[in-house]
Amino acid sequence: MASLFSSVLLSLCLLSSLFLSNANAKPKLGFTADLIHRDSPKSPFYNPMETSSQRLRNAIHRSVNRVFHFTEKDNTPQPQIDLTSNSGEYLMNVSIGTPPFPIMAIADTGSDLLWTQCAPCDDCYTQVDPLFDPKTSSTYKDVSCSSSQCTALENQASCSTNDNTCSYSLSYGDNSYTKGNIAVDTLTLGSSDTRPMQLKNIIIGCGHNNAGTFNKKGSGIVGLGGGPVSLIKQLGDSIDGKFSYCLVPLTSKKDQTSKINFGTNAIVSGSGVVSTPLIAKASQETFYYLTLKSISVGSKQIQYSGSDSESSEGNIIIDSGTTLTLLPTEFYSELEDAVASSIDAEKKQDPQSGLSLCYSATGDLKVPVITMHFDGADVKLDSSNAFVQVSEDLVCFAFRGSPSFSIYGNVAQMNFLVGYDTVSKTVSFKPTDCAKM
């Protein structure tokens, strides 16, 4: 009898412990937001006077400008990467504060800090939309110099001896900059077809001194990189370090938007999923690196010679903010030759785009299947991932050479559900009709 009583008591204790553990566990979040291409009619950057060809050529030029600000310092073994202030191809509607104050910001996997221009603005670039005034938010709070939020910024943070308030200073590769206070506030985001999600105590940069080439129609940046103050790292365990996006093709209907998912909404599973290791580099923790082994053009496989001669691991950055896929010049030349030799058509020139491999689009152009062989994951590209129509009668290869850095751009990622798991350190790809998500 005593033994039975002890067993029952032990079972009750275990159940009680399990209940308390579940009660104390933080709920996992799952939510989705719209990603608006900067050339969409829903974007403040949209210019109705431009043709689709002009918009695409502008995006190509932005790709080149973005990578040309990747520079290497002689005294460091790892490259030092600077991005232009006006780079990034996708926008998010987010709101800051209580009550929510809406801003349209660039969503950037190549940046960390979420920042916006704030009133009063001592020295700011012209902005079409109203500035966020922290005094109007009941949940806004400047953080102290000794806070974990301030120390997470490391060399980008500074402190005022007068009031112990944490300040930040960010400079971009084109000499633009933003300076202001580090604070925490409520961030609200969501999409047109889901309930808005409120995220409390999110680190933001409240910029009171900003200048350079920032576009007056933009309101700031949402950093989705791998650094300690990025939105992904801040949400941390609540989203299990997971986010994913599905980018609709450039040829989609104008009213269709891409999606970005977080947490339980970001799981990539099912038939057709392939995964590759996500490589972390301590000196460049913002950027998401993958390992590219080779590229196949039809049955011809070309071994990849990456830009990082010290290691073949982590030799290409996956980036949503760059349109083209950019590869080291010599390797790209070999790839272009393989693509050209497999296409039975006359080459055309397009000096406006700067792309070197173009063909007439008036006939039935048959292009080879191109497969990206990442470490452990073969990603087969559709023709729309490898070629872009730059005008009514011209299509061009959506890859090009770069002086040193390799970037897996967003055209190659369109109509794939691309999932990042920063805990398991993997990136997954699943062919998906993104317009139906």
Curated annotation (Swiss-Prot):
Subcellular location: Secreted, Extracellular space, Apoplast
Family from the record: Belongs to the peptidase A1 family.
EC number: 3.4.23.-
A GO molecular-function descriptor: aspartic-type endopeptidase activity
GO cellular component, one term: apoplast
Species per Swiss-Prot/TrEMBL record: Arabidopsis thaliana (Mouse-ear cress)
Result when mutating residue 319 to N: Loss of function
GO terms under biological process: defense response to bacterium; proteolysis; regulation of hydrogen peroxide metabolic process; regulation of salicylic acid metabolic process
Protein name: Aspartic proteinase CDR1
